[in-house]
Amino acid sequence: MTKSITEKRQLLVAPVYDIKNCGPWNRFSANGLLVHNSGGDKMNLQNLPRGGEIRKSLIAPPGHMICACDSSNIEGRVNAWFCGQADLVKHFAEGNDVYCELASKIYGRKITKADKKERFVGKTATLGLGYGTGWKKLQGALKNGGADMSDAECQRIVEIYRSSNYAIKDMWRYCEDMLSNMVAGYSGELGVGTRLKYEPGKVMLPNGMFILYPELRYRAEANDKEEKGYSYRRKNFRTKIYGAKVLENLIQALARIVVFDQMGRIAQKLKEKGGNSNGKIRQVVLTVHDEVVVVVPEEEAEETKAMMEEMMRVRPAWAPDLPVDCEGGIGKSYGEAK
């Protein structure tokens, strides 16, 4: 069944989506409609709710299964490693629950996965505070998840996170110093886990690509058009930038390289297995955040899942001491697989 987009660009709902004809470097199509590519498009699959009907509607072709595997907390791992937060890197390497570790500090007692509310607080703080987020935003995130906490308590959680993860906090300042150096015309290096070279307006990544800050400048006083602080040109506008935001840019870029390298290894293994041949599909069909999704013949699903987990536990050549891990699933639909 093929549906189309009307002239008013309204999506017509189709009962079944087939994820056969797509690939990791091609655009994702559902029933012939263009809905995703690795760089984003007008419509994407980045925020489908878990257990939702849309996930369930993405099904494998007859005789095939979907294998989905995500690189567990890749941003948190890369952030701890890049900043040199050694104790957190050790927790990741040993397979400890880092959410429970932080929650234990917050509540002053041992927190386990059985303590769902307390672990949720630890998880929200771990995921939300690595890039300089303040207590007010933390409070909102906790409230949205059903944990209503006072101003003072949220301020205390932020202080606990920052004192516990001092190397991450320090890196915000180092990133701010890098901006200052860039504006002054200097070059240098940044990072602990790996050293990233920078020069005015750009930072080089391990894969040879750059994060760019065109026309970067510092304004000592705000005016009608610009805020005080650092900013760079983005299309026709000035975009504010600061140390913690720079770190977020760097960590997300590094995490993307890790996941795309993992995806490349998986795609190569599927090709060696036979790829798309003799009526069989063996193909990476989708990436969502830190997740790789493939379609394979039913009889190869368990074997493929094991292969994906093996490939996604390989440490990058440029980050041999970065502890990576993953979790996979299998299903007839995307919803069943994850």
What name fits each language-model region?
Residues 1-111, 174-291, 306-312:
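Acidic, glycine-rich two-metal-ion catalytic cores of nucleic acid-processing enzymes
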Residues 75-79, 102, 121-129, 157-161, ...:
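Short alpha-helical scaffolding segments that buttress acidic/His motifs in well-ordered protein cores
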Residues 79, 130, 137-150, 157, ...:
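Catalytic palm subdomain of template-directed nucleic-acid polymerases
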Residues 83, 113-132:
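Amphipathic, charged-and-aliphatic alpha-helical interface segments
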Residues 107-119, 146-158, 320:
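Short, surface-exposed acidic
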Residues 120-122, 285-291, 321-323:
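Short Gly/Ser/Thr- and Asp/Glu-enriched loop/turn motifs at secondary-structure junctions
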Residues 133-138, 259, 326:
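Helix-rich, typically C-terminal accessory recognition domains appended to large enzymatic cores
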Residues 153-187, 299-338:
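Polymerase palm active-site segment centered on the conserved acidic dipeptide of motif C
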